[in-house]
Swiss-Prot record:
It comes from Oryza sativa subsp. japonica. Residues 131-157, 330-362 are annotated as: Disordered. Keywords: Hydrolase, Magnesium, Manganese, Metal-binding, Protein phosphatase. Its cofactor is Mg(2+); Mn(2+). This is Probable protein phosphatase 2C 70.
Length: 362
């Protein structure tokens, strides 16, 4: 369900870049929706040997998705676990940190600036890529808390999915909360590296009910069709439960994959793509287009056009964002050069089973 334009906005925000180990392309499009609530981050050089890519699909407004695109990767860098090499813990804590940072006066002010109350963005400019200035990632951030009339702001009622991929040498870590998705192509076969967090999944349903929530027509408390998300603070108000056990939680599911020469690329995309095509269909589409098109951003644009519905209503009418990250032949050297920076691992099973992440190692 949603409010649609009389004609779709088909202008696209596109970009591409890379480093010694990979190259990427991305594109986003507002489509039939009246607003653009997707955001994304693409950083081939988060540090000298690490790349970071993320897609964020907002609901109830664009502020939370843009907040994540601006801040989540910086929190990964700042977390003490990151400096010790524990990428999984650093990204896990950074998801929860987003909820904390959006509270209080500073959170209210940032959300107001990024959302509808702040500067207006239209068309393709609403698809945000956060590009830190040289050295910005290394600067200690000022104390986040500040005093003001909104010091007791409990956080936003709007929210966002978050699906990020962190690549360090031959290790790929995917962290996901919500129904955006990351898919790996290995020898032409699609492997889901994330799981869509819908309320009717047994583990999600159990947590929702235990926290005092309910599910109606596949929606948490009759409103949200996601079981995990950043933001949505009205569904995280049980003071007797930790953050990971709230009705809706920002806790990401983590997946770690050791990359090999058989791995060709990953696709990160919001559900505007996955509602129209299966994981394997997207992988097949990308392979076919790459046979004749070298520009990955052009491939992304073609994928958006392929998914766009001819008329409003049904699949193909959502905002659409996609990032393709293509791996170069593995080498021992770290990813030291880059261009165009733009802004508990469970067992996996084959993609076609549709009951969880799939295992590229089987």
């Amino acid at each position: 369900m949603g409010v649609y334009l009389s004609t779709p906005k088909t202008e696209k925000y596109s970009g591409e870049g890379g480093n010694d180990r990979l190259r990427y392309g991305l594109a986003s499009m507002q489509g039939w929706r009246t607003t653009m609530e997707d955001a994304h981050t693409a950083l081939p050089r988060l540090d000298e040997c690490t790349s970071f890519f993320g897609v964020y699909d907002g609901h109830g407004g664009k502020a939370v998705s843009k907040f994540c695109a601006k801040h989540l990767h910086l929190q990964v860098l700042k977390n003490e676990a990151y400096s010790s090499g524990d990428l999984a813990t650093s990204v896990l804590k950074s998801f929860f940190r987003m909820d904390e940072m959006m509270k209080g006066q500073r959170g209210w002010r940032e959300l107001a600036e990024l959302g509808d109350k702040g500067q207006k963005f239209t068309g393709m400019l609403e698809g945000i890529i956060w590009s830190p200035k040289p050295g910005e990632s290394d600067k200690p951030e000022d104390t986040w808390t500040e005093e003001g009339p909104h010091s007791h702001f409990p956080g936003p009622t709007s929210g966002s999915t978050a699906c990020v991929a962190i690549i360090r040498n031959d290790e790929l870590i995917v962290a996901n909360a919500g129904d955006s998705r990351c898919v790996l192509s290995r020898k032409g076969r699609a492997y889901d590296l994330s799981k869509d967090h819908k309320p009717d999944l047994d583990a999600e349903k159990e947590r929702i009910l235990n926290a005092g929530g309910f599910i109606v027509a596949g929606r948490v408390n009759g409103s949200l069709n996601l079981a995990r998300a950043i933001g949505d603070m009205e569904l995280k108000q049980n003071e007797f439960l930790p953050a990971e056990r709230q009705i809706v939680t920002a806790e990401p599911e983590l997946n770690t994959v050791k990359l090999s020469e058989d791995d060709e690329f990953i696709v990160l995309a919001c559900d505007g793509i996955w509602d129209c095509m299966s994981s394997q269909e997207v992988v097949d589409f990308v392979h076919k287009e790459m046979n004749t098109e070298d520009s990955l951003s052009a491939v992304c644009e073609k994928l958006l056009d392929h998914c766009l519905a001819p008329v409003s209503g049904g699949d193909g009418c959502d905002n659409m964002t996609v990032i393709i990250v293509k791996f170069k032949k593995p080498s021992k050297s770290a990813a030291t050069s880059s261009t165009n920076q733009s802004v508990s691992s469970e067992e996996m099973r084959p993609n076609e089973l549709d009951d969880g992440p799939s295992d590229p190692n089987k």
